[in-house]
Amino acid sequence: MTAKKTINRAVRGWCRHLALEACSSLAGLRGQFRGFDDRCCGVQLVLLHRIQPHEERKFEQFIVWLTKNFKVVSYSRAVEIIESRERVEPTVAISFDDGFKDNLKASEILSRHGLSACFFVCPSIIGETCPEKIKKFSFANLRKKDVREFLNWSELEQMKVAGHEIGNHTMAHRCLSDLQKSEFLDQVGGARSELMSRLGDVDHFSWPFGRFIHFKAEWVDDVLQLGHQSCASGVRGVHSPEHERGHDPAFDKTVMRNTVDMAWPLRHSQYFLSYNLLVGK
């Protein structure tokens, strides 16, 4: 990355931070996010990636805030509600992408609070211990430089026994919109087959990178025909009976997920989830 791009990214980051600080502070002053009335309804799927050791306390605070302000359900239950277009109180389900090692600790924190999540993983990197292979995979496929460990099969089994769900995130985290149909089927179908052979049922899929430009709308039906009950993006939104899904009609069979990051100030994540309900009521 050039110095100019680095500076531009830093400037955009600070502008985003300042805008969110202003919005979340103003909303707090107005008391908008201190509880929802009966006009607020809908399901939101939360998307996380990593919980660093120094972020564990903040993650637990976030979980406590969720339980106080939303009905928190399993990922599968949330998908059922979305598909049935059932009108429900503000409801949230939690998911993680990529299968980083620290997801094990996140699952333990969730279990301690009686909650579960769906962890979307890529079989080709599960259990890998070679630093060079991890570095190469992370840089080429995840576009990250600081990853050192991924979950192994034993840990995934442990998480599933604890009540969490394991989802399909393709075999190797390729950008699916760059692939031919046969490669796409290998990435998605191959991953599901391997996950099922190791862990049993795999009901949900999420595509890497998460934006609509990273997937092909005509492949949504293929994902479902392979046996998945849902096909998830990383596009923000709330699912309610009054609103269409996916913002783009071509993706109306997909489910939206709202990215939050424990590296952000907690109030920013709270603002996103609260604002979704207020604009969606």
Give the ranges of each region predicted by the language model.
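A short, Lys/Arg-enriched amphipathic alpha-helix followed by its capping loop at the start of a domain
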Residues: 61-69, 109-114, 162
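Metal-dependent polysaccharide deacetylase catalytic core of the NodB/CE4 family, i.e.
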Residues: 46-49, 86-92, 111-213
